[in-house]
């Protein structure tokens, strides 16, 4: 697969703590950013998003630039992550879906048969060119702060398409996987193409790192993950590595509840493995070493429980210090939450977390 977008020369940010940590080097301090840092916890976000639908917001370059930069200005985080949504490339390709407040992505016509899969539209680079435009604006806006691009992994996108929306048990998804494996793999091949096109658009525009979100992979057993999911996620990471101008761009892989899948997720081609709050980082690092003894020292990202941010500063400070200590067992550590920032989080607490991480880890 190729991408026709012209390639923007990548910024020289070799000393940026996020990129140094992702390479397993020793940065001047432990880098910190937060999943969903650009979102409803910020009053400035709520103001600029007022009255504008989510998917429209994601395709408005000036707005994407402003929202992406807001947490960098407010918190002093070590990376920005592109404001977008994991279902955006499906929407851009022509899949009928909407993001319903209080529910999440809702698909008009679920994909449940081989014919449905065959009819699923492909994504062309020009359909997400506005995302590339937003990245271009951000490179000027962010200065020396790295920009992380991202996309949803095929399994998580498939779950939304097959279930028709968010699901607790993913029963239709797993049923299709086991009853019609050929149809399942055809679906994930198409979704891997879509995801790779979306990521290559961001890479061509100049993002400094990428994260593949497999939000719902934790619903799977290790056996099922290896058979039905891993080959398609691996193809994405291989495609990213082969993208012109993207050599050396760090690749992060994250899912919720994936403590038993960490080694397999790394083996897909990730340089950094995101860990949720359920597994201590030193335990995660040990699991990664055991699963891939020939892959070098693992780099981990995480993993403060987002709910702890509501517990008062004494508890937050204690947990941050514990996580920093556990992270030292890995070959590198990027501080983050174990999932996204919750909408009612006090942004002042996030700023204090950034300050604490920087102060405690200064080298």
From Swiss-Prot:
Q: List the pathway annotation.
A: Porphyrin-containing compound metabolism; protoporphyrin-IX biosynthesis; coproporphyrinogen-III from 5-aminolevulinate: step 4/4
Is tRNA processing set as a keyword in this record? no
What is the E.C. number? Answer: 4.1.1.37
Gene3D superfamilies attached here?
Answer: 3.20.20.210
Say which domain of life the source belongs to: Bacteria
Show the PROSITE patterns listed in the entry. UROD_1, UROD_2
Q: Which reaction does it catalyse?
A: uroporphyrinogen III + 4 H(+) = coproporphyrinogen III + 4 CO2
Q: What does the annotation say about its assembly with partners?
A: Homodimer.
Name by which UniProt lists this protein: Uroporphyrinogen decarboxylase
Naturally occurring in which organism (per UniProt)? Saccharopolyspora erythraea (strain ATCC 11635 / DSM 40517 / JCM 4748 / NBRC 13426 / NCIMB 8594 / NRRL 2338)
